[in-house]
């Protein structure tokens, strides 16, 4: 009932609400239709995009307009189009709503002339649903690209600068305004910077000038100029834009030509000037003069000075010439001091005059110093010496010191030899002539004359002692003596002559000569020995021994004849019998008796024939046939042949020519038989003669004959003769090359080559040529117009050695053709024509000539555009006007007409000649000047001074500007108003009206002045205007209180508006207006025209200008309002403003990069190099302080230091054995003595030694080289840099040249320059040999460049290796006995040390064994159930990674030692085993152990997990070992160790490998002996529990226990079954997950009871030197910190185990990941972990099933983790989420239950863990647990390396204090603060029992696992509010795992 009532009651309200909803929904539907065409984005309505200019066509402008609606498809809702699309730059894709650039056929250019900066279009959107239209604006901004280079307005620029211009002066401002470079780009791309570039053709230009302000381009002088060095510079100036990307900047260059003007910087220079080498200085000059004594001035003036005194100004080109200074001469000082009495020098001409006669008795000489200086007030004097000698009066005659002279000369003496005064010719003949007028010690300057033999002898012209010399050779044989007289003459007096007798000494210059060459002698058989045969006589013209002759028979005598050596008589030898018919030919030699070296000789032949004693034979010719050749040029009478016959009886013989000479050409002597030439021969008529000659002794039968055959040889006695019948007048056509002209022919009657004729041309060889047959051709094209005929000389020459020739002249006429165009007399005609001349006026006559013959020239105008203005007569060439010209009708500056005219040959074929005619229209002054006003007004003070401006008139002329008719000038009309014209004037050019005189007029007076303006046109036109000038009252003119104002200096950094000073003026009842009228051309200052405050108007620059002088003026307001000024003396003042320099320029180093070197043997503080920085500021702002910034150098050495104020860098360390090292650092220069701005430069210093050096040996002194070293080094740099760019030559030393043995000698006249070179690319010295090649190869060029610095003759002699290098090589060639002995001794010492080292090692090992014995008893008592055997060592472990640095706290292990740590824990174990009260009672005895625990805990407190850990939150882990309560041994099990080395997080990516390389091999061997059948279970039993230092969840109220006996039985059974694992298969089985086969179990069953012994062996092994074993290497000290930290970071308290037989290698760490659940499957691992990066290897040991889980934390929700209580299937589960690892095991796993975990706590961000983490399997229980999480076991592969970093951790929860611990157990010592310790131990024991029960056996062949790449998830819980566990000892000693294993 109630329900019906409620429904009916609410129904109306529901209907109302429904209605409202329907209405609103309908309204919403309508609004939705209007959404189309709106923008789907927020922001401004306009779409703005940017695009680069010159973008390619189709560039996307807008990729999506984001307009709502659909424009395409079958049902479009909107329609899009473009509006306002100017020039159609934009295209629209309406479907995609995209905009594109449309630049087809054009370029989008932002620059002129297009100037498209932006494009604006409207996108029109039409809503098709409702019809609305919306416009969307799209603005496209065109971005500028740097696509244009700067352009200079002019191709080149020009500037002049005086050489005296100071450095820093701006010398060129020609780039200001539009005169510089422009760039049409925008923004920085269009801004111009100017820089000076290096000009290779003028290398000094960029150093001489600079552009400090690159934006202005003003060129500033950087270095001082010297006109005498260089007169012109070519400066290359580069203009570049300022594009942001330096690589995109564009540049252009221009050349600025700077001419240096000569300035007055050099003074006069005396002439002649002999320069000092390598300088511009003249050598000291001394002028000479000599005057006779007692002569009057009239006789001597002007005094002759040698050379004439003359000085010139060294500045020879000062412009204008009128500015060149004159030279004034004067005598500065002199000796004797009374020289002014006698001499005077003209100041302008330097003429020296004598003032009064000089007496030589008082003054023998004058030494004066003369001065020449400029007359312009800038003297710059020059000095010279003047020596005046006073000559004695010539009243004495010269005389000779000897009355006569005897001389000797060798006849063989050469010309120029000196006559000797002794026979041995050793001393010259001295002829001394003196004059008593001259001192005996001075040259009297006499003239000596010879009266004879002047062509043979001469006397030297000067000197006191004269010598005779030979002018031509003498011959003693011709003349033996010469006698002549010598006279001396002094110009006035003559001496008495003396006789000189010269005797010519003989020389062996003649050879003994026989009269005949041969002699014929007959001897008879009846002659007896000793009889004379012939008397030979030779003649020698020499005298003495040179003329004595000795005779000797050389050959032919056969011993039958002898000769007398003295007389030359040939006689028959003794005992010789002559035989008829024998003949002899004796060779006889005649020799003189001169010395053997000079001896001469000749020979003759004596023919001897033996005859019978009576006459029995006729005469007989020597031969029957004679043949000879006779030249036809032989002279008449020449002897041709000797036809002498012999008659045995000696009868007289008669000779005759019997036949062959009818013309009697030859003569034969009848008596002698000599045949001679009787007449001249002519070969051309008779060329051979055969003569028959006879010889008769008078008897009838006494006649014999002989034949003479004479051949006449030719001589060149005939010249070639031209054929006279060939034509000699020839012709040839012009302009034809190789044209035949004609032919000549010549013959020669001579024979052979003498008759061969050769032709040549005597002239015009370049125009004609002639062939060997005489044909003549043209060599080039002839031009008749140049020359119409030629007279060609043809030369015919025969072929003789001395040829004869003849010539023939040919007349050649050149025939004309039409080959020339008419040529105007001028190529350009320029004529001035007045405007307005009438038509028909002739104004020019042009003329053209055609050089061709018969040409008829006609003229016409070629340019058709002027034919209506001008007419040209076709024949006369007269040019006239067709219409009048008007100057004003032409454009400005173009009142001229230029056109072409041509001249052509009417009958010719050549093109016409062309000329240019320029008609300049002259303006004829059409308009007069017109004033801007008719009446001007002005005001003036009554006392205005002369030149005071009053007002300015202005007139304009309408004539074209720039012409004389438009130039307006002004003058005063003095006719209308004469008095005003007398006191006022107008400036002719400016029109400014000024006062002509100083005024003194009455106030209020008004003057009228008529000013006339006139032009310079023709005729002159003018106009006039009136100026009314009012004289003001003095009180109306303001007066300044001061004439000069000097405000305080203004800082150059003063901002605009900074007040400089205040000026003030006063006037009666006047408002004053101030203004600056002069001195402010740069607009640097402004003035408040009311207050007079002067302020800074624009930036100042002290370096540009240091002061300003402003002229300010004060005027009354009335005057100003009248636009007038009234200047006067009182209303103007000067303001002197000084600019104060500020430190606004940083220092700039001369170089950006300095290169230097230092030798290895350099001493401390040796100078390296000097740096220098300059500053444009002044004062202290330019005073530098230098410092160095040097990178750290080993051992904390500084390396280098710099002198603070000099910039000299010095060494600050020694560089021994540091060759090839280098240092790079920076040098900082700070101005203001280190307090101001700074600049920096880089410095490179390379360490070298003499192995890098070369010595340059020069023949100049070291002092000269040292002075010029900078210039010389620059030259060497240039040549080295040709090979290695940027290289620097460094000078090591400059010294005297060293030479000799071992370079022990020094020569200071020569220099050794030791250098080396640094390569900036390698920063090291260039190889010595390479440096030698660079320099030696250019030695000639270097010497040429060194010449100006070395001087004449200076050069480099050689380039050699330093002496130290040579000595080092010598010392290194052999090894001395001392070195060998030292090496042998060192070898012996090493051999002796090896046994000692071995003894120490053995002793140390025995000591370790004894320490291990101490632990045996404890190990026996702590024996536990038998463990399974350990797995064998892997066959091939991977190489270990490099060890990281040891963790913090590791030093404790090193200090205590492993044995000490072990003993401490054993002692603690025994104390625990004594009972519950053992620890408290014996606390004192264990103080050491507690102290160790405390120190160890404290050492771990600083360790951190992620970044530095706060002191209040330390996180060291606690590791305890627990066993079940029922086990009496485990109940009192002590804490042994937890090997946790804290590591810094910065090394967490590198796993610990400490000691691995040293101990791994040894520990692997030992581990095999330690393995036993109980080892595996023993390790599992004794897995440690790790408590991290964090607040835990609450522990359960009571522990759950299991039956210990049942658990032990099960454990032992599993152990026996697992013994089947073969020892060699280490890692192939797991004690928790797999079982051994039966065979292996039986095989090792006997080892079950050997646990104690094995434990003892293990302890022994550990204590005897091996802290690690391969079986337990994963529990080693080096790996434990990583695992422990991983558990701290990544897990809640849990139990994690790792089987003892598994060798797990921890992978690099990963950041922990927190997951909520995990389902895992287990499989039997092969127990070798993979070492892939970012992987973890671990195993899960389940908790015993009987352990109760702790209660969950009530307030925190937690997602459950489901665990199954039944075995998991073999197939893998569903794919886990990322970062999870799934394990597939072939065997069933223990049942698990779902364990809800507590929610995660609020933890700090997890850091990168230092090592991988292992996570345990959660306990198999159905009760939720809060103290554990689960993680799958690791899949291990057999390829892993040493698993030293794999451990197991167990983290039990902390106990709640309210639960308490069991009463019968009280923790002792360090465990006293652990809560609920018994429950924890029991839980752990039950867990291990559960492990044994739930590990069924597995097939060994299937035992293979793989370590996954990712960790499974984990859940980390932490509660900040829980109390922390007490610190426990974190042990360092590595104990056997049977007692305690820690992570």
Curated annotation (Swiss-Prot):
Gene3D superfamilies in UniProt: 2.60.40.3430, Cadherins (2.60.40.60)
- Signal peptide position in this chain? 1-26
Bias regions of kind Low complexity — which residues?
1784-1795, 1822-1834
**Regions crossing the membrane:** 1382-1402
Instruction: Give the GO biological process terms.
Output: actin filament bundle assembly; actin filament organization; adult walking behavior; auditory receptor cell stereocilium organization; detection of mechanical stimulus involved in equilibrioception; detection of mechanical stimulus involved in sensory perception of sound; homophilic cell adhesion via plasma membrane adhesion molecules; inner ear auditory receptor cell differentiation
Extracellular topological intervals:
27-1381
Which residue ranges have biased composition labelled Polar residues?
1846-1858
Compartments reported by the entry: Cell membrane
Mode of membrane association:
Single-pass membrane protein
Q: Which UniProt keywords apply?
A: Calcium, Cell adhesion, Cell membrane, Deafness, Disulfide bond, Glycoprotein, Hearing, Membrane, Repeat, Secreted, Signal, Transmembrane, Transmembrane helix
Composition bias, Pro residues: 1431-1449, 1742-1760, 1769-1779, 1796-1821
Could you name the Gene Ontology cellular component terms for this entry? cytoplasm; extracellular region; membrane; photoreceptor outer segment; plasma membrane; stereocilium; stereocilium bundle
Region Disordered, as annotated, extends over 1425-1453, 1475-1533, 1714-1865
Entry-linked InterPro entries? Cadherin-domain_protein, Cadherin-like_dom, Cadherin-like_sf, Cadherin_CS, EC_dom, EC_dom_sf, PCDH15_12th_dom
Subunit structure and binding partners: Antiparallel heterodimer with CDH23. Found in a complex with TMIE and LHFPL5. Interacts with LHFPL5/TMHS; this interaction is required for efficient localization to hair bundles. Interacts with MYO7A. Interacts with USH1G; this interaction may recruit USH1G to the plasma membrane. Interacts with TOMT. Isoforms CD1 and CD3 interact with TMC1 (via N-terminus) and TMC2 (via N-terminus). Interacts with PIEZO1.
State the protein's purpose.
Calcium-dependent cell-adhesion protein. Required for inner ear neuroepithelial cell elaboration and cochlear function. Probably involved in the maintenance of normal retinal function.
Free-text note regarding domains: Cadherin repeats 1 and 2 mediate calcium-dependent heterophilic interaction with CDH23. Three calcium ions are usually bound at the interface of each cadherin domain and rigidify the connections, imparting a strong curvature to the full-length ectodomain.
Disease listed for this protein: Defects in Pcdh15 are the cause of the Ames waltzer (av) phenotype. It is characterized by deafness and a balance disorder, associated with the degeneration of inner ear neuroepithelia.
Return the protein name.
Protocadherin-15
Origin organism of this chain? Mus musculus
Q: Which gene encodes it?
A: Pcdh15
